[in-house]
Amino acid sequence: MKEQEIIDALKNDNDEFRRLYEEHRRLEDKLSELEQKRYLTTEEEVERKQIQKQKLHKKDQMAELIRQYRQRVLQAN
């Protein structure tokens, strides 16, 4: 099963994954907004770093759910 197929299945069937995915997208949008600016204030730079950390944490959590899903599929076959 391809990664995108797993992501689509989890987005449809797993509330936790869907929540993480949506939050990750929201953080990505926020980060993009900050990166569009020519210069960042000190506060914006701190916010950018915090967003990057939060985004990475969400991505790690989603990766774990994908790994668990793959494991369940392999065990079922």
Predicted regions and their residues:
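Extended, charge-rich alpha-helical interface modules
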Residues: 1-77
